[in-house]
Amino acid sequence: MKIKVGFGFDVHQLVEGRELWLGGILLEHEKGLLGHSDADVLVHAICDALLGAANMRDIGYHFPDNAGEYKNIDSKILLKKTVELIAAKGYQIGNIDATICAERPKLKAHIPSMQQVLAEVMGIDADDISIKATTTEKLGFTGREEGISAYATVLINRV
């Protein structure tokens, strides 16, 4: 069995007048993430990790931010398409380990919902998705609440 590991990272700016989508769910917050799509940094980091593990470039290559068809798209659609892309190359997801960096909103209570939603999109068990949340102790752009970032590591294996 061929096992591969991928790493993904994404960051988006927090702005007024946008909804805050994280981990495939809508969160109540006075600001949202700015981006061509819904700007869900966690989903984008997972997509990049999956594509990287399969040596299939990155999310911007497959879903360019200058393509009208992806304007304001639900990132869960991009995730589903990413899973289909790696499956077409003969890979399935083993597990995902991800971290969201945000000062606010507090995310602990939302993590089980994120796991469930993302598991359904990817067709895997929620137990195979670890999501953690942390702050940067008020340091940097995250600490100043100017943006939110996410990191993801994935394991995929050849079917």
Swiss-Prot record:
Pathway: Isoprenoid biosynthesis; isopentenyl diphosphate biosynthesis via DXP pathway; isopentenyl diphosphate from 1-deoxy-D-xylulose 5-phosphate: step 4/6. PROSITE patterns: ISPF. Its cofactor is a divalent metal cation. GO terms for biological process: isopentenyl diphosphate biosynthetic process, methylerythritol 4-phosphate pathway; terpenoid biosynthetic process. The record marks 36, 135 as: Transition state stabilizer. It comes from the Bacteria. GO terms for molecular function: 2-C-methyl-D-erythritol 2,4-cyclodiphosphate synthase activity; metal ion binding. Keywords: Isoprene biosynthesis, Lyase, Metal-binding. SUPFAM superfamilies: IpsF-like (SSF69765). Binds 1 divalent metal cation per subunit. It is an enzyme of class 4 (lyase). The keyword Ubl conjugation does not apply. The keyword Metal-binding applies. It catalyses: 4-CDP-2-C-methyl-D-erythritol 2-phosphate = 2-C-methyl-D-erythritol 2,4-cyclic diphosphate + CMP. Its EC number is 4.6.1.12. Gene3D superfamilies: 2-C-methyl-D-erythritol 2,4-cyclodiphosphate synthase. 4-CDP-2-C-methyl-D-erythritol 2-phosphate binds at residues 10-12, 36-37, 58-60, 134-137, 141, 144. A divalent metal cation binds at residues 10, 12, 44. Involved in the biosynthesis of isopentenyl diphosphate (IPP) and dimethylallyl diphosphate (DMAPP), two major building blocks of isoprenoid compounds. Catalyzes the conversion of 4-diphosphocytidyl-2-C-methyl-D-erythritol 2-phosphate (CDP-ME2P) to 2-C-methyl-D-erythritol 2,4-cyclodiphosphate (ME-CPP) with a corresponding release of cytidine 5-monophosphate (CMP). Belongs to the IspF family. Homotrimer. NCBIfam families: ispF. HAMAP family: IspF. This is 2-C-methyl-D-erythritol 2,4-cyclodiphosphate synthase. It comes from Bacteroides fragilis (strain YCH46). The gene is ispF.
